């Protein structure tokens, strides 16, 4: 059990500093990485490329964004009412 927790902590990677978002409030950073992930995923799927290159954006937004925001945005994307341009 303790080894499992140590492994999780060792492998945990949080969002690195992004100079586009120097302030303490990281809401915009969260939003931008969510959009970037889905744009990257859409572009790579259209080209028939490997979607795993987009994984960095997903890890960053998963680290920064509250789960409730992500689930709401996912629901809105599925419904076609998402306000962002993907």
Curated annotation (Swiss-Prot):
Membrane topology: Peripheral membrane protein
Sequence motif Cx9C motif, location on chain: 30-40
Cell division is among the record's keywords: no
Full protein name: Cytochrome c oxidase subunit 6B1
Family: Belongs to the cytochrome c oxidase subunit 6B family.
Record PTM N6-acetyllysine, positions in chain: 62
Segments carrying motif Cx10C motif: 54-65
CDD domains: Cyt_c_Oxidase_VIb
PANTHER family, per database record: CYTOCHROME C OXIDASE SUBUNIT 6B (PTHR11387)
Alphabetized UniProt keyword annotations: Acetylation, Disulfide bond, Membrane, Mitochondrion, Mitochondrion inner membrane
Transmembrane domains' residue ranges: none
CHCH domain mapped to chain residues: 27-73
Domain of life: Eukaryota
Location within or outside the cell: Mitochondrion inner membrane
GO CC entries: mitochondrial inner membrane; respiratory chain complex IV
Residues bearing the modification N-acetylalanine: 2
Pathway: Energy metabolism; oxidative phosphorylation
Major localization class: mitochondrion
GO biological process: oxidative phosphorylation
Oligomeric and partner information: Component of the cytochrome c oxidase (complex IV, CIV), a multisubunit enzyme composed of 14 subunits. The complex is composed of a catalytic core of 3 subunits MT-CO1, MT-CO2 and MT-CO3, encoded in the mitochondrial DNA, and 11 supernumerary subunits COX4I, COX5A, COX5B, COX6A, COX6B, COX6C, COX7A, COX7B, COX7C, COX8 and NDUFA4, which are encoded in the nuclear genome.
Pfam families: COX6B
């Amino acid at each position: 059990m303790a080894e499992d927790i140590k492994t999780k902590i060792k492998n945990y990677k949080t969002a690195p500093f992004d100079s586009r978002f120097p302030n303490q409030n990281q809401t915009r950073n969260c939003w931008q990485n969510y959009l970037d992930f889905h744009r990257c995923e859409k572009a790579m799927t259209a080209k028939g490329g490997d979607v795993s290159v987009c994984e960095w954006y997903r890890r960053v937004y998963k680290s920064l964004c509250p789960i409730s925001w992500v689930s709401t945005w996912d629901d809105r994307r599925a419904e076609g009412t998402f306000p962002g341009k993907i």
